Amino acid sequence: MKSLKSFLIWGIVVLVGLASFTTLALSRGEQVSAIWMVTAAISVYCIAYRFYSLYIANRVMQLDPNRLTPAERHNDGLDYVPTHKGVLFGHHFAAIAGAGPLVGPVLAAQMGYLPGTLWIIFGVVFAGAVQDMMVLFVSMRRDGKSLGDIVKQELGTVPGVIASIGILMIMVIIMAVLALIVVKALVHSPWGTFTIAATMPIALFMGIYTRYIRPGKIGEISIVGFILLMLAVIYGEDVAHSSFGHWFDLDGIQLTWAIMIYGFVASVLPVWLLLTPRDYLSTFLKIGTIAALALGIVIVNPTLQMPAVTHFIDGSGPVFSGALFPFLFITIACGAVSGFHALISSGTTPKMVENETHVRMIGYGGMIMESFVAIMALAAAASLDPGVYFAMNSPAALIGTDANTAAEVITTKLNFSVDAATLLHTAKEVGENTILSRAGGAPTLAVGMAHIMSRLIPGEAMMAFWYHFALLFEALFILTAVDAGTRVARFMIQDLGSIFYKPFGNTDSIPANLVATFFAVALWGYFLYTGVTDPLGGINSLWPLFGIANQMLAGVALIMCTVVLVKMKRDRYVWVTLVPAFGVLFVTCYAGLQKLFHSDPRISFLAHAGKYRDALASGEVLAPAKDIGEMSQIIFNDQINAGLTALFLAVVVIVAVYGFRTAMKARKVGWPTAKEIPAVYRDGKQPEAQHEA
């Protein structure tokens, strides 16, 4: 009876999913509700988590609840701290969910809602969530070692050192882009800056409360923390208009220094004091807002106004250059698969897992949650008037700086009808002077969310409130990835430094921690500063590099996981990581080669640098540069971006070659050769027998 009931329930879920995808894919010309995107995603997520993640946990990984985790064995109260799975899920989700799932899908909406929807949903099931879960498992079995250290341990010293250097540089770019999105959202926004600043003392209070005042009382401090957070959000507007509001009214360079200082402090304090409670606190706002947006989509039932597929799949779009293949995949980035997650899954999280069986919920479940965020972002963007969408995301050099010119260009050149009155009215609704050329994706998502939420909770000026609340939400969403990422970068630098000076790798050494943290913050802080001062706006230069770096890192992580499975003598399951590894690497390497060698200056870093170099030689100044100095800066930035792309490609090729060689050697040996830490079992218990999924 129970099996019949289960069969019927899952049969209904499958039918709902099929109906949703059929409606999304086959509707042409008629109006399509955004609800179909939500139901399609939820159906696939439920099926994947119930069956595929269980298959991986029980058969591929063979998780053992009686095996002590690194957090239990070391428990130093600093980095290794056994943490309740609900709290750790919040920390992990807050750490991995950065700019990618919010910004990438919004930019990808240029090509229509269907390509992005398909990649976000199926990419996460078979690649993104698999990577997160597998890397977390592999790292835990090696005392929470970093990705670079695991590559060195399992593939050899040479590929390990090369991978560690490449991974660190990839991490630096990712951190810089995440921080840049925050800066763009908070520039001269005292309301948002105050609210985010307020989360820090609130988090310190929560950490001290659960550590010393009421240990283990997660429920009650969660309620207190949530109330304090809501008060900070609500009264942030009053603070912004008060006599000391100017303290929080910062420009881009001031915010850059503030974020760098915060990243340094957060990385050296014990995780229980600031990092974990702050991320847990941020998760309330993150999940709550996304849940409210999903509820708003269901109740308001907005129509997807963007076509399923637009004519910009040929690469001629104004938002980002390049054809659907391969640039859609690197643009969406974290919404489907993210190499950054591999750094968190081999950084802070494996040192805090309370029981090995929690890997499934935290690793696979956390990534599914992020993918759902990406679907919500895509739905919000696709429900906007396409004319408004392209007005917000097209460069000023194309559409101009006034509403009349923009409306004419969008209607005649981009073939999406919009009038100047609509653009002016939208700007007035959200309390802005203009919405033209608000690139980066975050403002577009904020307008989309505001349109939906203001219809869910109507009232005078609610559109402006929800717009600014959404910008705040996005900044808080992203900043939590910056603090965790800085700590991970610290671990990576210490791992690298220990090759030359072994005591430097001691994470208990305060001087070593401080020096490594300084270098980590200085590296990503440099690229953040160049992004803030970039004549092209920073996002335009760094986002493509971010996408390529992020996906290449995912490929490296999946190669490592594949080699580990071979060395564990689980060859029959190697397809679980090998297939997504091949797919991710093929797409990303192809994109990387185009960014280097394509002849179109809109696509290639080198071609773009050549165009500006030729103009500079003839004494010409090309927009958006205003003088010769900015022309030289653009050329230098293009050359740096091209050099980093070449470095990332070289790292991936080297790791792939060594991975293949290592796997072939391991297959010839008749016993497992994976270098796990010897198992220690809870209360003298023996390993638990594994069950089929």
Stretches found by the model and what they are:
Residues 1-15, 47-102, 283, 323, ...:
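Membrane-interface "cap" regions at the ends of multi-pass membrane proteins
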Residues 18-31, 100-102, 114, 172-188, ...:
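Transmembrane helix-loop junctions in multi-pass membrane proteins
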Residues 22-28, 33, 79-142, 153-157, ...:
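Membrane-interface helix-loop-helix modules in multi-pass membrane proteins
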Residues 31-50, 54, 108-138, 148, ...:
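Extracellular loop-to-transmembrane helix junctions
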Residues 35-43, 47, 53-60, 166, ...:
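Membrane-interface loop-to-helix entry segments
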Residues 53-81, 107, 117, 121, ...:
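Flexible loop linkers connecting adjacent transmembrane helices
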Residues 154-172, 365-372, 439-441, 459-470, ...:
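Loop-to-transmembrane helix boundary motifs in multi-pass membrane proteins
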Residues 297-313, 368-448, 484, 529-534:
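Extracellular/periplasmic helix-exit of transmembrane alpha-helices
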